[in-house]
């Protein structure tokens, strides 16, 4: 288990490597959050790619893609098939991929699809408490894309899910939990305003893919995601405490985020 | 017929109920305006949900959805079929639904579809003058999504459409008209800059769905929509008189909008 | 060959005509950039229309459309077929159309499609260096949607492509090159921050369509596009040097852009 100081160093190292290597992140994601996701990846220093065609997804994976994001937010049968194709190719090429199981549980198509995808070796699974509980097989009440459970409620499910799938699981909420099933890192960066902007959660999935492209382990990538996005959210709220301008400042903050900001602001909890 | 004072109280009551109950609004809407629509619903205090699959739309309607928006802006045959399924289920569950017939008249697929949907008991129909006239069966010249008629021109058509469909009709323009076919409420909040940001009109459709989830009548929901969005537009323009920053301030204004703002700014016309 | 003074006058004339005539630009474009594209067209004074259905594209072209944009960024087989239909109708009606071959080269579906579309008389082809080289038949290394070649590298390919297709070719980069195969105009407006916001390049394709609707020649429309967007980018960076707020200021700057700004800032290179 890393100390807080080691964790902070690992987060700043991931940030530095994203900016230095500009990993290409192929995001098969929902149409609502495509603009924010692409802009957020650009702001942190990664290169976003988005497309719909399965054959082209394979082409892109073979052309220097650093990580793949699969987000089920507005999935259709056709997009689901493209995701399956992309995941197989990513695994064949040993490209890390992230599963973001938006609103699984109540919605049938994505729940079936997520149940299949979780068996195909995602490196990271990112969700709120309700989504992680549903994906782990526990029932949970959701209200649309919003979670009604706390992330602490989901920690047991997250550990089971991590052990079952081999993925690092990132449960986002007031406290963010990152676990590979054995170790758990709890972090408390972020601001409630992040839930008043559409796509911030989904963009954490994309950021975790960028981190997975450069980080030594999926667990570290999950922790870096929670800390970097959380700190950017805090900085954004200090600049802009209303949701429209907050979303703008969130991008500005990710662009400006320095290693010193990480050292000063990262908050790890003892468990 | 309510007095202006009663109307203002009813608008502030709707605003309070949206913030208190956070209704889930399922928006089957066009891809151009999805981000603004979702952010606007979050800013006012509602919870947005968006998806593409017909089966999932039914699942979502059965999971606590407060209102459904059907917006035809980028409709395809496949999305049209999902909309038909969703509307049937909403009616079965007595969930209010809103029809936003973007650019009907010149465009064949959506004109046929809107003609069918208007017969299926929408609670609110929201459109600009050209769209309402076309949907009511009058010819009207449109220029893409922009209206070339004034909302006053469309008032007769709006009353007929309301009587025929049983919906409250909201005609948006410099003056906004809300009618159930018998009563008409004319309001004059808003700013011309709202037409320089894509999706503001479509977001009024989404806001009217949020209002329909909490308001005592569809007519009141239409009036509340016109007043709340119009006032937010005025406040936004005072902060930010250029279109990029205006769009940001529009979200900030909806978030900040107080009952006092409504009392001070609501402008009802005598007809 | 026009002098710099003549070129500046021609650019300001195009800007004036867009604002005066508000051309309707039908954009068949990728889902990531739809909101920015629509907002950018509105900011400069054009009217955006977006839709997915092939039959409706034909309807719209017959209803006063000034120019058509075909952008391959998230193309599917179905959207590709709609694009083919729209291009045929645009040519039949003598409506200028723009091809934006996003990320052609590595990705198979769009590369095949772009190869067909370039033979169908686009008035303007807009791309970065890698895209123009790939479309002209030269191999080039791309990293997702980003170009790894400089626009100067692509100038030879651009001239060949222009002569072969009859289109004006606009190669965007640090220096922007506009050519009809015989004349070349090089312009140096813009700012590197434009590449940190998703959709700025794609929005140049849309702006070039708006210019093509009003400009005396496709070549002039390409030059006007490069200069107007570049100047707006410079003005935006002076206001907002971080990417989130830069994107907002870019729209504000296009809205505010005056003929005097063009005269003062336009930078033409001698070749």
From Swiss-Prot, chains A, B, C:
It catalyses: 5-(2-hydroxyethyl)-4-methylthiazole + ATP = 4-methyl-5-(2-phosphooxyethyl)-thiazole + ADP + H(+). Keywords: ATP-binding, Kinase, Magnesium, Metal-binding, Nucleotide-binding, Thiamine biosynthesis, Transferase. It holds the Pfam family HK. One of its GO terms (biological process) is thiamine biosynthetic process. CDD domains: THZ_kinase. ATP binds at residues 126, 172. This is Hydroxyethylthiazole kinase. It comes from Akkermansia muciniphila (strain ATCC BAA-835 / DSM 22959 / JCM 33894 / BCRC 81048 / CCUG 64013 / CIP 107961 / Muc). The gene is thiM.
